[in-house]
């Protein structure tokens, strides 16, 4: 019997990369492994994929150094850019590339005393309005970076705000702005993340940046299997009790659920202390012994309760799947009103991790 455990499949991870390559056969891949590889384990994911991708994308310098210290030699890109001028010498000696999106960063690079020049990606705001230089500033920043001795190479990066809305023309508007801004300029380009890879073929360009689809999860509320993807993460726990329960009796804090029949209640060893969302409504499914059973009562810190039915054969120690291939995380996300991204990255350190082939 095991407590809450995530099982991470290297086979599924490699399979998903092959699907991504089929979607964008002419693009190089920057695999996004920020936030501990979306909760999958950055060391495991980066080492598994090093020979299958062309580089890695992270949000923070500490994440980049974690990947590098794991023996990975491929380029690493800071997707938010560096936070302090003191970071630049570290980037220089560790083959870490950086986004530049403001004047302070440009000034810091020009002033820095670096052992090796660094590769820079100029972030262009094409409509996300979060990070990036304006379209009118692109020529200025590009020329300044190209003439800076501390810069080895300049690329271009932007980000779609509505790539998961396949009926919106805003993605095409952003793409055309990006293409116009980088026209006749030397440098690789990347604008497509997961949504762009799946739904906007013209956006693939020289590099793509797969994130959530790499982990076998759809960026929209359609099961990833529709795109040939396989979930890399399966969240499981165990039944720690199977109890007879009388009709009319409540279950859990507040007694908000009352059984309408004699039944058997199962107790699963997982709760919001493990990162399972407290706000899941009654009826949210858990997969046990080949069938879905509904959560009843409130999720507590360490346990959830399920209605196993009066004729169940389940026993203590049986595995319960909270999400995975048998129960898509996209479905759990839709029920809870959360994003799949949130569910995966909110799991707490006490959840055990098993890496499987």
From Swiss-Prot:
GO molecular function, one term: alanine racemase activity
Any GO CC annotation of this UniProt entry: cytosol
Described purpose of this protein according to its UniProt entry: Catalyzes the interconversion of L-alanine and D-alanine. May also act on other amino acids.
Ligand binding (substrate): 130, 301
Listed GO biological process terms: D-alanine biosynthetic process
NCBIfam families with a match to the protein in the record: alr (TIGR00492)
Family: Belongs to the alanine racemase family.
Disulfide bonds: none
Enzyme class: isomerase
E.C. code: 5.1.1.1
Reported cofactor(s): pyridoxal 5'-phosphate
Catalyzed reactions: L-alanine = D-alanine
Identification of the protein by name: Alanine racemase
Highest taxon in the source lineage: Bacteria
Pathways involved: Amino-acid biosynthesis; D-alanine biosynthesis; D-alanine from L-alanine: step 1/1
Record-linked InterPro entries: Ala_racemase (IPR000821), Ala_racemase/Decarboxylase_C (IPR009006), Ala_racemase_C (IPR011079), Ala_racemase_N (IPR001608), Ala_racemase_pyridoxalP-BS (IPR020622), PLP-binding_barrel (IPR029066)
Residues annotated with N6-(pyridoxal phosphate)lysine modification: 34
Active site: 34, 253
Alphabetized Pfam families for the sequence: Ala_racemase_C (PF00842), Ala_racemase_N (PF01168)
Keyword terms: Isomerase, Pyridoxal phosphate
């Amino acid at each position: 019997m095991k407590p809450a455990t995530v099982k991470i499949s290297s086979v599924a991870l490699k399979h998903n990369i092959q699907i991504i390559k089929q979607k964008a056969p002419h693009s190089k891949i920057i695999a996004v492994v920020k936030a501990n590889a979306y909760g999958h384990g950055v060391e495991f994911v980066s080492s598994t994929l090093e020979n299958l991708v062309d580089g890695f994308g992270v949000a923070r310098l500490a994440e980049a150094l974690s990947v590098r210290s794991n023996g990975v030699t491929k380029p690493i890109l800071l997707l938010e850019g560096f936070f302090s001028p003191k970071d630049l010498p570290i980037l220089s000696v560790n083959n870490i590339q950086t986004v530049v999106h403001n004047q302070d960063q440009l000034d810091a690079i020009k002033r820095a005393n670096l052992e090796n020049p660094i590769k820079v990606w100029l972030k262009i705001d094409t409509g996300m309005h979060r990070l990036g230089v304006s379209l009118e500033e692109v020529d200025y920043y590009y020329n300044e970076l190209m003439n800076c001795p501390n810069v080895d190479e300049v690329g271009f990066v932007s980000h779609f705000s509505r790539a998961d809305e396949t009926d919106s023309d805003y993605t095409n508007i952003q793409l055309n702005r990006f293409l116009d801004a980088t026209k006749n300029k030397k440098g690789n380009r990347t604008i497509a993340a997961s949504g762009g890879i799946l739904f906007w073929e013209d956006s693939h360009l020289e590099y793509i940046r797969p994130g959530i689809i790499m982990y076998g999860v759809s960026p929209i509320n359609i099961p990833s299997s529709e795109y040939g993807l396989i979930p890399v993460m399966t969240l499981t726990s165990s039944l720690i009790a199977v109890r007879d329960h009388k009709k009319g009796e409540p279950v859990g804090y507040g007694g908000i659920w009352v059984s309408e029949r004699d039944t058997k209640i199962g107790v699963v060893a997982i709760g919001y202390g493990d990162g399972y969302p407290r706000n899941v409504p009654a009826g949210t499914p858990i997969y046990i012994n080949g069938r879905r059973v509904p959560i009843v009562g409130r999720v507590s810190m360490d346990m959830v309760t399920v209605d196993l039915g009066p004729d169940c054969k389940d026993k203590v120690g049986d595995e319960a799947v909270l999400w995975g291939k048998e129960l898509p995380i996209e479905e759990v996300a839709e029920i809870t009103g959360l994003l799949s991204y949130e569910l995966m990255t909110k799991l707490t350190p006490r959840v055990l991790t098993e890496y499987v082939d």
